[in-house]
Amino acid sequence: MGLETEKADVQLFMDDDSYSHHSGLEYADPEKFADSGQDRDPHRLNSHLKLGFEDVIAEPVTTHSFDKVWICSHALFEISKYVMYKFLTVFLAIPLAFIAGILFATLSCLHIWILMPFVKTCLMVLPSVQTIWKSVTDVFIAPLCTSVGRSFSSVSLQLSQD
């Protein structure tokens, strides 16, 4: 959320004589604006959101609309996407950033002061519990399972077809 100082370098050409199959938009070199500010998405978390008009609206070769319709709809798409994003960020960015900050601070506090001490306590007590559990298993459960196994090992079934 910084102050936008550069202007978008997009030009829209609508010649009556040229009927080309491209959109007519010419974009500036990305290297021109690469050093103008900091990278706001250094870990590329939102790289999937970089979509353009051709990613949303596509006309096959056999069904083309008029070039002026295509160019105007492309321009309207880009302008409305730009304006709506700016409008929504003006009203939603600060409150959502505040809410996200509170949420992450709360989760960090719970993780640091409640969850990790509980996990460390469980890991500290676990060897003692493991020793006691092995003793209980060896004294009570193993003989019971052994005797039940021996009892059922002598059972035999015979099926007769009558």
From Swiss-Prot:
Protein name in UniProt:
Caveolin-2
One GO biological process term is: endoplasmic reticulum organization
Name any one GO molecular function. Answer: molecular adaptor activity
The family this protein is said to belong to: Belongs to the caveolin family.
Its keywords, alphabetically, are:
Cell membrane, Cytoplasm, Golgi apparatus, Membrane, Nucleus, Phosphoprotein
Q: Which organism is it from?
A: Chlorocebus aethiops
Which residues carry the post-translational modification Phosphotyrosine, per the record?
Y19, Y27
- Phosphoserine PTM positions: S20, S23, S36
Q: How does it sit in the membrane?
A: Peripheral membrane protein
What's noted about post-translational modification? Answer: Phosphorylated on serine and tyrosine residues. CAV1 promotes phosphorylation on Ser-23 which then targets the complex to the plasma membrane, lipid rafts and caveolae. Phosphorylation on Ser-36 appears to modulate mitosis in endothelial cells. Phosphorylation on both Tyr-19 and Tyr-27 is required for insulin-induced 'Ser-727' phosphorylation of STAT3 and its activation. Phosphorylation on Tyr-19 is required for insulin-induced phosphorylation of MAPK1 and DNA binding of STAT3. Tyrosine phosphorylation is induced by both EGF and insulin (By. similarity).
Where mainly found?
nucleus
The keyword Glycoprotein is assigned to this record: no
What Pfam families does the annotation carry? Caveolin (PF01146)
Q: Where in the cell is it found?
A: Nucleus; Cytoplasm; Golgi apparatus membrane; Cell membrane
This protein's gene is called: CAV2
